[in-house]
């Protein structure tokens, strides 16, 4: 880069700072807002300012950009004795090249202007609709994410501070609002547009990361991609080091960053569990030191729930690391001791957090405690369902894993039973993260597969039929948006439940659970093939168990409405399994 280009870049940065300061002064004096700098718009859009010679300017801009190459920082020349030995290798390359892309991005918050130029201002979404959606998110939905997603109390402030967080917030709210079906696509499209536009933007802030946290937590169609990208960008901003600063300096700003890092960790572990893929975030001091964070002066009441989830997903992470990826091989008997150890850890987690969380919570009632029961059973079914790995259609369950098989069935049953019988949990369906709904889908499919493959050995078909039928009825009664996972799941579950009505004529009835029988070595499988009247295979999907890929059943069943038409896609009552 030549000196002239460096000088021009420095001038532009100086102008941005002066323009931002002047805007703040104008706002304080209640004077009209200044228009945005044309140079900023040009750089953001990747094109020069429009004028009478647009084509000529465009060609000149391209040639100049190609000539200049990657952007570099204009800083004093360093000498070898200026600093100590570099502790990160990339620092050496940055010292030699001054490439801007090699350093952590600047904090852009001080350079933000106050002009509002978003899809609401452009008329794509009415202000009244936006206010309604924002109120829904602020007053209710954000509590399901521990109060981390809503930093601002008014929509106007949110729009001024972060258009992308505004779009993410309104998208999630529209997903849950049954009156917002016609505007969900508008909000979702705007969020996707802003994400695409900012993919290579160097300057990001906490609200940018917060927007990706919100989307990763609720938007199942974007969560896998956004979660991984958000973790990378958060690492660039040293978000993972905020924990130490929050503890030592008792900084609320650092505590906010630490909470965002915890949410990213939770989403990462949730997605790794759902997809059976490796997680990205490893356990560092901030993850291992969640108790110190909870005891620090910066901790809030919501942090109890947050750190409780950090503790739980760390157990899930260890479970995944033990079993690894599904290679189609049976689980060795020696793993039984590990399973029992994990069971004790889950029991301890359940006992602790059921005791620490209060009966009622602001705006979401008793859902946190009932959610603890759900999460406990989600973890149980995830743990015990591994014993079905590698069992072919004619392979029995090894006798030493029979108790684990029953525990998995009991956990799945408890999940569905709690959702259909507890009114607080039923209300919480419209608000809970996509992970919880996905694990509910897994519990349903697990029971259906068990009932088909093993008949009444583990659970009666009629019991599964009744549970899933009632769950479908519960989902259809919810006041949620058309694109909410519960509505998308209802049609698919209804069709899968119908398969249980097929008579099980050839089912062999082994006496594997007869108390008079000792030293039972196996559970006899049910019919290997079910045929319809034409003799075709009735159940032709993979009957093996596992979470990857996506529960081993056709995900298209969740993308149709009640009529079977394809849905368009947009770019202390103990209901659980108390530990014994």
Residue ranges and their predicted role:
Residues 3-19, 86-105, 119-131, 147-166, ...:
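Extended, leucine-rich alpha-helical cores of fungal transcription factors
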Residues 18, 27, 31, 35-114, ...:
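C-terminal, low-complexity intrinsically disordered regions in eukaryotic proteins
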Residues 24, 28-31, 175, 236, ...:
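Conserved amphipathic alpha-helical interaction elements at protein-protein interfaces in regulatory
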Residues 140-144:
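The first (N-terminal) embedded transmembrane alpha-helix
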Residues 170-181, 217-218, 388, 527, ...:
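A short secondary-structure junction motif
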Residues 286-292:
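Active-site oxyanion/phosphate-handling segment shared across diverse enzymes
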């Amino acid at each position: 880069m030549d000196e002239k280009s460096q000088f021009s870049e420095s001038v532009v940065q100086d102008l941005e700072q002066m323009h931002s300061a002047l805007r703040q002064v104008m706002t304080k004096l209640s004077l009209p807002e200044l228009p945005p700098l044309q140079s900023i718009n040009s750089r953001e859009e990747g094109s020069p300012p429009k004028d009478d010679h647009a084509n000529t300017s465009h060609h000149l801009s391209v040639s100049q950009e190609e000539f200049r190459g990657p952007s570099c920082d204009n800083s004093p020349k360093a000498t070898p004795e200026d600093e100590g030995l570099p502790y990160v290798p990339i620092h050496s390359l940055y010292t030699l090249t001054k490439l801007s892309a090699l350093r952590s991005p600047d904090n852009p918050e001080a350079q933000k202007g106050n002009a509002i130029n978003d899809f609401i201002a452009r008329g794509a979404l009415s202000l009244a609709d936006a206010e309604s959606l924002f109120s829904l998110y602020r007053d209710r939905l954000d509590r399901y994410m521990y109060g981390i997603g809503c930093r601002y109390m008014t929509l106007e402030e949110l729009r001024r501070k972060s258009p992308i967080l505004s779009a993410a917030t309104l998208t999630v709210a529209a997903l849950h609002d049954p009156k917002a079906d016609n505007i969900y696509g508008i909000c979702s499209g705007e969020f996707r547009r802003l994400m695409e536009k900012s993919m290579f933007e160097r300057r990001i802030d906490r609200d940018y990361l917060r927007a990706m946290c919100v989307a990763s937590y609720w938007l199942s169609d974007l969560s896998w991609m956004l979660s991984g990208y958000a973790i990378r960008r958060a690492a660039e901003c040293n978000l993972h080091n905020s924990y130490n600063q929050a503890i030592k300096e008792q900084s609320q700003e650092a505590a906010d960053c630490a909470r965002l890092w915890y949410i990213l960790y939770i989403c990462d572990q949730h997605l790794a569990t759902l997809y059976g893929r490796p997680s990205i975030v490893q356990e560092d001091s901030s993850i291992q030191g969640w108790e110190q964070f909870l005891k620090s002066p910066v901790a809030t009441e919501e942090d109890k729930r947050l750190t409780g989830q950090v503790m739980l997903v760390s157990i899930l992470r260890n479970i995944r690391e033990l079993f690894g990826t599904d290679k189609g091989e049976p689980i060795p008997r020696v793993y039984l001791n590990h399973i029992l150890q994990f069971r004790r850890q889950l029991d301890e987690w359940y006992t602790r957090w059921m005791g620490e969380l209060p009966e009622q919570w602001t705006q979401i009632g008793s859902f946190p405690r009932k959610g603890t029961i759900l999460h406990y059973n989600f973890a149980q079914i995830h743990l015990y369902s591994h014993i079905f790995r590698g069992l072919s259609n004619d392979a029995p369950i090894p006798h030493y894993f029979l108790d684990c098989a029953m525990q998995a069935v009991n956990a799945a049953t408890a999940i569905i039973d709690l959702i259909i019988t507890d009114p607080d949990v039923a209300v919480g369906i419209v608000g809970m993260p996509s992970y919880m709904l996905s694990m509910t889908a897994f519990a349903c499919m697990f029971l259906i597969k068990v009932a088909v493959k093993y008949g009444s050995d583990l659970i009666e078909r009629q019991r599964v039929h009744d549970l899933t039928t009632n769950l479908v009825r519960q989902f259809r009664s919810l006041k949620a948006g058309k694109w909410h996972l519960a509505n998308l799941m209802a049609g698919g579950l209804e069709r899968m439940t119908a398969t249980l009505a097929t008579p099980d004529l050839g089912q062999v009835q082994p006496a594997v659970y007869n108390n008079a029988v000792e030293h039972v070595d196996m559970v006899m499988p049910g019919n290997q093939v079910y045929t319809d009247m034409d003799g075709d295979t009735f159940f032709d999907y993979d009957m093996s168990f596992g979470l990857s890929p996506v529960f081993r059943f056709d995900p298209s069943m969740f993308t149709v409405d009640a009529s079977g038409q394809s849905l368009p896609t947009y770019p202390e009552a103990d209901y659980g399994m108390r530990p014994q």
